[in-house]
């Protein structure tokens, strides 16, 4: 049978491991994106293994080479901007000082976690307009092949306000990259953008109205994940856009789907306009009654309705208190105040002492007036009750007419073709890093390109990742409430161990009645022994209530078992008493008073005394 202590300890350990497990799960949940679903890659696609600890001793970086058909690639590893054109345009409706696209671009390695031989395009200027573009190897025509656009971004200094998105410039006759500016016609705009605490991942495409020929921007729904860490962790992230001929799209960050949907259903405003619209020439008739309730015209004000009674009146039952001083002011100048020595009446005006409460106004000062109370006769202005309007016609709205510009586009994937890629950006933060652009139609080609470029960067970054302690500290700096989790996680096992090693002492009830084997044998006289034997016999003859004994503490139960030892001990004590009587025959002449004194004493007596074990029986 297990002891109570072992049961308690077992329960403590179960509670400890349960709490520790819950805390561990809550902490780890902060480092995971709960809403992100990992993409199921094709079996033939190459997976990017970025597990820590698998980094080879030396990184032999090689410039990625495209496999398969591509429309555009750029790695910047050559160190030259061959094929790229800097804009010389000016923004419209802007001051001349800031209208010029004079932002500086450089080709550099990463500031942190650099890979030898790998370079990227870096935006170097703050608070300036930047514009640079390059022509594709061949225009992309939306037909029966998917569109895949992929590139890398690293906000090396974080980001306050600025973007890192790209524009796919429409294939128009007047396209001139030297005149590339914010109003240049584009087909798709894609990439991260941030200002203040608004973190965005744009996917915007321009859809042409088939009847009017007017282009309208369509914005994809925002991602369901928190984008903040992609702007703040200063790591290189891979952004991918996939548009399929079946009018679906996917947006990925670091090969993980963060947004997906239909071009027909998941964009704002919708692709297809409504079939009917409100008639702009329709007007509400003058007699149209929109009142749901009206005053009852048949209601009459009661004759006894008095509108002249005020809402409150003076309480006439209150009288002015004795000692009220009508002529005394409530505040008086402070008699102890003195004009400052540096007070200049020409500059500061006439000096006046500060005012204090009048000490004479203990009961009250000034003009006395009785307090105001609610007037029981007050009824206010009479108004007729409201009833349903029999002429109510409802809220008027213009009639619907067929939409003259209605159309139905069942295949919005067929957008305007594009033939150039451009970056047209304004940023308040410099050192934004771009690398490894690719435009293709096969996901396997884009995945292999990512493995050869971005995958190597991730291997290096993971190898340089700080230890778990530094990661926990960094996480706590970003989320201060994690300090409480750390404290509880570290303090809980210490508290449990302390409670096991130094348990709280429980005071025993009836400690005086507990049998102790270490009790010292005390000599007793005949009278004391006789009295004790009588008490023991009376206790043994008394019935024991088992139900009450079960309610006592464990220590008390053990005590009762010892007290319930049968008559064997009582007979031994009787024999001791008889021996005591034989030894005391020579002292029969002792007086009764002396015997009482001997009975009350614990160690004195005329006759020889034999030591016996003293037992006490608790009296109920």
Swiss-Prot record:
Modified residues (Phosphoserine): 570, 586, 589, 591, 601, 604, 611
GO molecular function: calcium ion binding; unfolded protein binding
Keywords: Acetylation, Calcium, Chaperone, Disulfide bond, Endoplasmic reticulum, Membrane, Metal-binding, Phosphoprotein, Repeat, Signal, Transmembrane, Transmembrane helix
Endoplasmic reticulum listed as a keyword: yes
Topology versus the membrane: Single-pass type I membrane protein
Biased composition (Basic residues): 611-620
Residue ranges annotated as Lumenal topological domain: 30-480
Main location: endoplasmic reticulum
Cytoplasmic compartment segments: 502-620
Start and end residues of each stretch annotated as Interaction with PPIB: 327-360
Biased composition (Basic and acidic residues): 275-294, 529-558, 582-593
Protein name: Calmegin
Organism: Canis lupus familiaris (Dog)
């Amino acid at each position: 049978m297990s002891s109570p202590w072992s049961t308690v300890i077992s329960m403590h350990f179960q509670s400890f491991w349960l709490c520790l497990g819950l805390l561990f799960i809550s902490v780890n949940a902060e480092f995971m994106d709960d809403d992100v679903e990992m993409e199921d890659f094709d079996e033939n696609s190459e997976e990017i293994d970025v597990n820590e600890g698998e980094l080879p001793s030396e990184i032999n970086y090689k410039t990625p080479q495209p496999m398969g058909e591509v429309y555009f690639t750029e790695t910047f590893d050559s160190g030259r901007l061959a094929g790229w054109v800097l804009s010389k345009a000016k923004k419209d409706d802007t001051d001349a000082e800031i209208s010029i696209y004079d932002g500086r671009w450089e080709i550099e390695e990463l500031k942190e976690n650099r890979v030898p031989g790998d370079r990227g395009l870096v935006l170097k200027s703050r608070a300036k307009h930047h514009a640079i573009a390059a022509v594709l190897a061949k225009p992309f025509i939306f037909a029966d092949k998917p569109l895949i656009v992929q590139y890398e971004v690293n906000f090396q200094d974080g980001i306050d306000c600025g973007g890192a998105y790209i524009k796919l410039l429409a294939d128009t006759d007047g396209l001139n990259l030297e005149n590339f500016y914010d109003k240049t016609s584009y087909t798709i705009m894609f990439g991260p953008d941030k200002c203040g605490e608004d973190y965005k991942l744009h996917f915007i495409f321009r859809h042409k109205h088939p009847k009017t020929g007017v282009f309208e921007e369509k914005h994809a729904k925002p991602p369901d994940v928190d984008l903040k860490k992609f702007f703040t962790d200063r790591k290189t992230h891979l952004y991918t856009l996939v548009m399929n001929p079946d009018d679906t799209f996917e947006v990925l960050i670091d090969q993980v789907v963060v947004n997906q949907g239909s071009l027909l259903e998941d964009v704002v405003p919708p692709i297809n306009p409504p079939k009917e619209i409100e008639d702009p020439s329709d007007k509400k008739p003058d007699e149209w009654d929109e009142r749901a309730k009206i005053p009852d015209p048949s209601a009459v004000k009661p004759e006894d309705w008095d509108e002249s009674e005020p809402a409150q009146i003076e309480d006439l039952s209150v009288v002015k208190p004795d000692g009220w001083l009508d002529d005394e002011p409530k505040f008086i100048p402070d008699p102890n105040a003195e004009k400052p020595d540096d007070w200049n009446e020409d500059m500061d005006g006439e000096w006046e002492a500060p005012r204090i409460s009048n000490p004479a106004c203990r009961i009250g000062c000034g003009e006395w007036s009785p307090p105001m109370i609610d007037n029981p006769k007050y009824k206010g202005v009479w108004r007729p009750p409201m009833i349903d309007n029999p002429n109510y016609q409802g809220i008027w709205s213009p009639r619907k007419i067929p939409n003259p510009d209605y159309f139905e586009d069942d295949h919005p994937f067929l957008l305007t073709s594009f033939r150039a890629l451009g970056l047209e950006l304004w940023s308040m933060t410099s050192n934004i890093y771009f690398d490894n652009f690719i435009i293709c139609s096969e996901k396997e080609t884009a995945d292999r390109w990512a493995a050869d470029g971005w995958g190597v960067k991730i291997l290096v970054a993971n190898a340089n990742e700080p230890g778990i302690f530094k990661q926990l500290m960094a996480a706590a700096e970003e989320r201060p409430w994690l300090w409480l989790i750390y404290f509880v996680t570290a303090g809980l096992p210490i508290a449990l161990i302390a409670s096991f090693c130094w348990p709280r002492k429980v005071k025993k009830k009836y400690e005086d009645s507990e049998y102790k084997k270490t009790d010292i044998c005390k000599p007793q006289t005949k009278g004391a022994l006789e009295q004790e034997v009588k008490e023991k016999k009376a206790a043994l003859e008394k019935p024991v209530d088992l139900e009450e004994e079960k309610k006592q503490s464990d220590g008390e139960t053990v005590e009762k078992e010892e007290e319930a030892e049968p008559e064997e001990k009582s007979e031994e004590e009787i024999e001791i008493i008889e021996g005591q009587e034989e030894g005391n025959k020579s002292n029969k002449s002792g007086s009764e008073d002396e015997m009482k004194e001997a009975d009350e004493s614990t160690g004195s007596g005329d006759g020889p005394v034999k030591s016996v074990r003293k037992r006490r029986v608790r009296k109920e």
